[in-house]
Amino acid sequence: MSEPRLRAQLVDYSQRLHARGWVANHDGNLSARIADGRFLCTPTATSKAEVSADGLLIVDGSGQRITGRSKPFGELGLHMCVYKSRTDVQAVIHAHPPHATALAATGLAL
């Protein structure tokens, strides 16, 4: 998939997460694999409702910023671990759906 199309999809999914209430304020983050061991990711401290294609960052496989004005989000290391251990995974989304958060707060085992 082309980088511009991937950027558009990350923006679309960011806005969907926000619209559904699955992320609050600056919570949650998204990333996607692009060519040559690089990754697109959402910036830190940005509402998912306000994510824009030109505001996305490009990072290398260790999570170091290559392009973009903002800093990468703090959980990027988790995303990188997923990509390293699962080469078939093309994108990672970290959200906080209210029902999942409520279940986690109960301490019940799955």
Q: Where are the predicted features?
A:
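Glycine-rich flexible loops
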Residues: 1-110
